[in-house]
């Protein structure tokens, strides 16, 4: 794990995180994801912001693909592993990230169109990617911060 000092952005500190700790965090996240899904709790994602501030290296690695994978896979095991959370794609600070909602969807779709499996075959079908994007768009339209 590499952490950057906000006051000295060019300096970083490396911290060893044990595999057992990582496995524990993964199990807690999976349990929370299933709880969120069962209660209909929505999760907002900000792909460009998440790429900059997290450990993912590309849009194709974004956690949204693990949180909700209906229509992009028919692998029963992968479908069962995913909590199928009510997710949405959003933008973070437009002044900092210079993006739009349309751009965030396009970045995810373009990244997914390039992903290949172990044999070098395209992992996702373009039509399925756009169905997945549309499902997420609809979930985003239903999410609200209202108490009603």
Identify the residue ranges that each predicted region occupies.
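Second-shell residues forming the walls of enzyme active-site clefts
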Residues: 16-42, 50-75
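Amphipathic alpha-helical protein-protein interaction segments
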Residues: 22-25, 53, 94, 98, ...
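Mid-to-C-terminal alpha-helical segments outside catalytic/metal-binding sites
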Residues: 30-39, 103, 107-148
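Secondary-structure transition/capping motifs at alpha-helix termini
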Residues: 39, 70-81, 114-119
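Short acidic/histidine-rich active-site segments
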Residues: 45-48, 83-100
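Short beta-alpha connecting loops at secondary-structure transitions
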Residues: 51, 88-91, 120-125
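Histidine/acidic-residue-rich catalytic or RNA/ligand-binding cores of hydrolases
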Residues: 53-64, 97-110
């Amino acid at each position: 794990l590499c952490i950057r000092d906000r006051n000295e952005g060019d300096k970083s500190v490396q911290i060893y995180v044990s595999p057992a700790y990582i496995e524990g965090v993964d199990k807690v996240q999976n349990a929370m994801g299933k709880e969120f899904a069962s209660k209909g709790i929505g999760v907002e994602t900000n792909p460009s912001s998440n790429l900059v501030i997290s450990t993912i290296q590309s849009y194709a690695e974004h956690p949204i693909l693990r949180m909700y994978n209906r229509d992009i896979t028919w692998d029963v095991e992968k479908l069962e592993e995913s909590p199928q959370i009510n997710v949405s794609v959003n933008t973070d600070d437009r002044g900092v990230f210079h993006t739009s909602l349309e751009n965030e969807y396009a970045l995810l779709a373009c990244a997914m169109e390039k992903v290949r499996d172990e044999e070098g075959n395209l992992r996702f079908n373009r039509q399925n990617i756009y169905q997945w994007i549309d499902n997420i768009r609809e979930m985003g339209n239903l999410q609200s911060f209202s108490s009603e």
